[in-house]
Amino acid sequence: MEFKVIAEYFDKLEKISSRLQLTALLADLLSKSDKAIIDKVVYIIQGKLWPDFLGYPELGIGEKFLIKAISIATNTDENSVENLYKSIGDLGEVARRLKSKQQSTGILGFLGTSSKESLKVDKVYSTLSKVALTTGEGSRDLKIRLLAGLLKKADPLEAKFLVRFVEGRLRVGIGDATVLDAMAIAFGGGQSASEIVERAYNLRADLGNIAKIIVEKGIEALKTLKPEVGIPIRPMLAERLSNPEEILKKVGGSALVDYKYDGERAQIHKKDDKIFIFSRRLENITSQYPDVVEYISKYTEGKEFIIEGEIVAVDPESGEIRSFQELMHRKRKSDIYEAIKEYPVNVFLFDLMYYEDVDYTTKPLEVRRKLLESIVKPNDYVKIAHHIQVNNVEDLKSFFYRAISEGGEGVMVKAIGKDAIYQAGARGWLWIKLKRDYQSEMADTVDLVVVGGFYGKGKRGGKISSLLMAAYNPKTDTFESVCKVASGFSDEQLDELQKKLMEIKRDIKHPRVNSKMEPDIWVEPVYVAEIIGAEITISPLHTCCQDVVEKDAGLSIRFPRFIRWRDDKSPEDATTTDEILEMYNKQPKKKIESPPIDESV
């Protein structure tokens, strides 16, 4: 299969904003792809070489490396490449223009390369894999030579998307949900197969693997798919409410209630003597927690399992729970064994999804919890999350206050009974978060996605000082603007912000972003931040839940304030538009709706 086919489809996809059109075009690409390499095609569409959970290196190629490779491939002086890049702001477009110029002036033939020698997807994939995996002395020069070699063989359009792929900035506006729908259309006979494909992806979060199974065995093979140790399950997510009475009513009057710990959610896999730890974002974080690997090996029973819990920093002297920030300090230390001494951790387990070749995601919570408790040996490091069973509001409140007093964020209220399955990859009312209230503020924080930035004035002139934030709409796979955040940042964070956003800056709005407000710069929807505010209000400036509460208006957050970055969350893990609407409906209503803030100031 020629890489040109993918490049041509990427070129079309980049110009489309309609999700339906994106999906149809993507389905067409998948149906025309070589089935023998369908997994690689899917990974390339996702903008990666392999799933994050494998823990393999990313391409990690900086601008200077790419400029050098483009310079060699197009026989252009490096300074000229750099100047063109400064003028255009897109290295992919720089590569396209220089390759076009090279072809038109006949230099290509002079250099001994032939446009008839087409670039194959297999060749692109194997070469880029070598670039990613090459380390040690001389690796820099080898990486540049390998990239330059690919670019020499590429036509202008191929060069554009090769460079963007290596940068990690394809800019074609495709999320995993769109890929899933396209796979259902291409291989499953239509949109009706989406649920089958989505269920399989939720149990095995590897789109390339799912595509390979479909083309080799058919869509029916996905129906019997079970979790597999080493491939993470997409985590079950909770809804949120701030009223204990309503929560208990939602779950049917009785529930299992766990402490909600302020740590890092972890999915732990074991097969024989091998143990893997995956983050909430399904990244392989095993190397960050050698102590947890040791604890699981020592204090759990079973040859093969997938369990879930929270890794929490604890005080080395008292054993008391420390904050999430303490855990982040540990992750920033270069010497992991020194970090283990300074920031020890405990693991609080709360679920079991797979055990000894049996899929437990379809079994009730009480069955899963009972088995989980039976495989943990008595010890001081790996424990079952502190929990009780409640059937009245008083007990729920009492346990909630106890959780807060002992350093927790609140509690997780979980439905029990035969229907209380593990809903992989889904957010629903089987689990409900009850977190502490914030005085004079919203009942809970929200996690929003950065989609744009605004330049400051005065001493912050010319630098980003506020952010356009959006909530995720899973129904449309888009990000809808909610607020503009300008407070809560330290000077150090603002300086860091400038660098972060410049790396993901876009010339135009991302196809998955829905916003009336025009920021000074648009960015890729990559970063997630935790935000608090005074209340949720109706606003004509924002698109979150537009026309749902009031015609021509959406919902916004009044007096939003930045709390922290949520590096553990992907953009699709952000607070949903439905959750924002639910929070709006639950907050005490004033006689007159708060006027929208003029966010242009």
Curated annotation (Swiss-Prot):
For this protein, the record's Gene3D superfamilies field holds: DNA ligase, ATP-dependent, N-terminal domain, DNA ligase/mRNA capping enzyme, Nucleic acid-binding proteins
Q: Where is this region: Disordered?
A: 568-601
Cofactor(s) needed: Mg(2+)
According to its UniProt record, the EC number is 6.5.1.1
Q: Which UniProt keywords apply?
A: ATP-binding, Cell cycle, Cell division, DNA damage, DNA recombination, DNA repair, DNA replication, Ligase, Magnesium, Metal-binding, Nucleotide-binding
Record-annotated active site = K260
One family name in Pfam for this protein? DNA_ligase_A_N
Give binding positions for ATP: D258, R265, R280, E310, F350, R427, K433
Q: Which reaction does it catalyse?
A: ATP + (deoxyribonucleotide)n-3'-hydroxyl + 5'-phospho-(deoxyribonucleotide)m = (deoxyribonucleotide)n+m + AMP + diphosphate
SUPFAM superfamilies per the UniProt record, alphabetical? ATP-dependent DNA ligase DNA-binding domain, DNA ligase/mRNA capping enzyme, catalytic domain, Nucleic acid-binding proteins
Provide the GO MF annotations for this entry: ATP binding; DNA binding; DNA ligase (ATP) activity; metal ion binding
Any Gene Ontology biological process: DNA biosynthetic process
**Function, please?**
DNA ligase that seals nicks in double-stranded DNA during DNA replication, DNA recombination and DNA repair.
The family note in this entry says: Belongs to the ATP-dependent DNA ligase family.
Protein name as annotated:
DNA ligase
